[in-house]
Amino acid sequence: MSPVKRWGSPCLFPLQLFSLCWVLSVAQSKTVRYSTFEEDAPGTVIGTLAEDLHMKVSGDTSFRLMKQFNSSLLRVREGDGQLTVGDAGLDRERLCGQSPQCVLAFDVVSFSQEQFRLVHVEVEVRDVNDHAPRFPRAQIPVEVSESAPVGTRIPLEVPVDEDVGANGLQSVRLAEPHSPFRVELQTRADGAQCADLVLLQELDRESQASYSLELVAQDGGRPPRSATAALSVRVLDANDHSPAFPQGAVAEVELAEDAPVGSLLLDLDAADPDEGPNGDVVFTFGARTPPEARHLFRLDPRSGRLTLAGQVDYERQDTYELDVRAQDRGPGPRTATCKVIVRIRDVNDNAPDISITPLAAPGAPATSPFAAAAAAAALGGADAASSAGSGTQETGVTSLVPEGAARESLVALVSTSDRDSGANGQVRCALYGHEHFRLQPAYAGSYLVVTAASLDRERIAEYNLTLVAEDRGAPPLRTVRPYTVRVGDENDNAPLFTKPVYEVSVRENNPPGAYLATVAARDPDLGRNGQVTYRLVEAEVGRSGEAVSTYVSVDPATGAIYALRSFDYETLRQLDVRVQASDGGSPQLSSNALVQVRVLDQNDHSPVLVHPAPANGSLEVAVPGRSTKDTAVARIQARDADEGANGELAFDLLQQEPREAFSIGRHTGEIVLTGDLSQEPPGRVFKALLVISDGGRPPLTTTATVSFVVTAGGGSAVPASAGSPEHFRPPGSRLAPSGPSLQWDTPLIVIIVLAGSCTLLLAAIIAIATTCNRRKKEVRKGGALREERPGAAGGGASAPGSPDETARGTGPRPNMFDVLTFPGSGKAPFGSPAADAPPPAVAAAEVPGSEGGSATGESACHFEGQQRLRGAHAEPYSASPGFGKEPAPPVAVWKGHSFNTISGREAEKFSGKDSGKGDSDFNDSDSDISGDALKKDLINHMQSGLWACTAECKILGHSDRCWSPSCAGPNTHPPPHPPAQMSTFCKSTSLPRDPLRRDNYYQAQLPKTVGLQSVYEKVLHRDYDRTVTLLSPPRPGRLPDLQEIGVPLYESPPGGRYVSPKKGTNENV
């Protein structure tokens, strides 16, 4: 190729040569290196490319980066290529991390019209010591075994220093100079640093278990920076000790063969000073320990306590040898061995055995008390070395028997046994504790426990019995076994309320649901039988007929009663609620209680104006113009539905205009004039505010405006509205000085009626008491008059029924008898205190009249006396009129322990013979209904002068005259005191034997059945005193058997013949 062709036109060759040279010059490049420190301030000049490259800078020269670069780190000025630190500054750790060198490289192009140049720039960022070392944690725990050898290295966490080079981490050390450790800092092949804790000497945990050290890390800056951390070194235990027995290698122990199970033989407390599993010792039997010994003895693996696990028997084996091994639980466990020799000591251990098998209930589940008791094994008596009379107490067994079980019901089976033979094996058994159970022999060595009486759980719920089994050895051994019998409950008791009636008060307007009261009932039964529930017994309340359950409710579980509605006293004042308490048994038992809920009144009603009726809350009253002062104008009537103080009304007139001309009675409501209206023109109106208030707290009021209109003329002051004229006074009438009128209501009327009834009852009681007292005085006065008179036959006595006797109250009374006194025994002198005692009070009672007497009732007076018997004297009597015969004397009959006085007329009705009906005594078979048998057989012998009898009386029988008392002459020795007064209600006792009475008695048998009316008199002797009882004729009845009847004999009077008392000399009591 020719040059021309190659280079083109010859004229273009110089231009092409210039361009080639320029390109070659531009292709030349240069590397410029700068260095700066991190953390220099933004704008710091690093270098100028134009100066460092010795370039001529013209106006068109420009420096630019070849590619985009982070201008926040470095900036290049276009004019001369000056390099400065950017606004973000330079942070070597952020730009290069832990790299040994940190270089920022970039290309800068310098071009102008003359030349083009590429400059490679490298800026090295140098490190400064702006970071201190830092430990990852403030507390660094380290563990090292006490068996670790010297030189053991334990890795530690290396502190972190973000600086590099000399400013980075240079050393880590311990602050304590004298320590069994040191810290070594090493640099690995990859440049990373590591720290190790090096053990300088052997450790012993038993002497020191831990170390507390301080780590110090330091860099190489100027000045250097450092950091600290706490290093905790815990020494781990090593199994370097073996267990040790305090007893040594061989231990001997002696054990009685009757020792109970669980007895401690030996405490093998082997100790190991190591910690944790290394010092945790486990005890086991050695391989040479026989299996039988393993069953009889128990070795606690944790505590090493050797106890008795079974019953040993000296007769079977007397020595046991046990190998016990103690081993810790550390790695490479260490062991120790001890030989234990157990020697058995012989005792008399064969006591009787007792086995109790309770009777299981039919179909009882396995978990029931019946089945549990029946499944009890035979618990034999433990061997006991005891003297005669001693025994062994056993664990008891419990049986359950229903309380309704019949007598002779089977409760349990008791079996006894004894391992001994001969007399030592013969066992006797007994049951103690209660008579409701007994033992019944069943077969050899077995007994039945049966009930001996009916049971009641509420009285005795549990019986603690004792079974005693004793053998016949010498000395005998016995076994004592407690035995408990629990009585099962049956529903045989109904719930019982604490009281039959509960009284509750509640104020009216109570909120619904308010609590009223709580009723409580108790049921002594158990379980569901004693679980009480409550309910209301339905009943109708009031006239409305509503159910009581709409008023109150009762909590079935607690018995709390709550109100279901708000009560109103004006409609319901008392609510009677019956609550029924029922148990949960079958059949169910229940009982009722009455709860009386009283509703208390509250002031809940305002007064209501009744008359005159208001119109739109106002009243108008016409007042005559000629009315003067104190003239009644009107009467206001109001009512209040409340009661008591809440219903008491008060009236007031307020705000009278134009002047106060009227006043109203505060309690009467009567309006009167207080001034003169004669000068007022007709049509003049006076206005006032009527205020009606009740007495409640707070009071309720009602107001009305009253207009008083003055009218012409003198008409009646009548309110303009319609009203009853009777409520107003006539015009011109004056007010009388009377108090407020009473307001009668039902409670007040009831109170007045009750007060009047009580007054009448009290007056009747006083009248009766006064009458009885007057009769007592009359009786005492009559007795005194009789003693003042010379005798029964003396004159001067007023006739019976005379006016003076009637006035004194001593007139004749039908079927009434005077007191008969008999000679005393003379044991008490006539001046003794007992003889001078005053007579007691006398009581009177009404008794029905006797047959043949008057139709009116008779008075049977009650007398009691404490006077001694003064002498033999007989006092007259008065018989009932109308018989047409001479009054018959009374008959005194001795019944062996007391005297009986029988009227002569009534004695005819007695019979000493059998009635023929088979109710008599021996030798009393013949009947007698004539009434003379008693007269013939009552007295066998009488002294002449006392009885008017002759010799013919022994053959023909006694006449009526024989029965008359001797009253021939006056009593020359009257007693100084009133005669003894008799009691109608005292018991008869024996009298002293009469010294004048002979010892001949007549056997008179009186019939048991008395079908007659008579008056009989009992004589009561109390310390040789006598009391005679006067009674009205008895009603037909059964009399007890009579004792021997003795008749006292008295000397005849001087006349030698019995003289009947005159009619005019009789006195009545």
Swiss-Prot record:
Annotated GO biological process: cell adhesion; chemical synaptic transmission; homophilic cell adhesion via plasma membrane adhesion molecules; long-term memory; modulation of chemical synaptic transmission; morphogenesis of embryonic epithelium; regulation of synaptic membrane adhesion; somitogenesis
Region Disordered, annotated ranges: 719-738, 777-859, 905-927, 1031-1069
Domain of life: Eukaryota
Compartment(s) of residence: Cell membrane; Cell projection, Dendrite; Presynaptic cell membrane; Postsynaptic cell membrane
Keywords of this entry: Calcium, Cell adhesion, Cell membrane, Cell projection, Glycoprotein, Membrane, Phosphoprotein, Postsynaptic cell membrane, Repeat, Signal, Synapse, Transmembrane, Transmembrane helix
Extracellular side: 30-747
Protein's name according to its UniProt entry: Protocadherin-8
Gene: Pcdh8
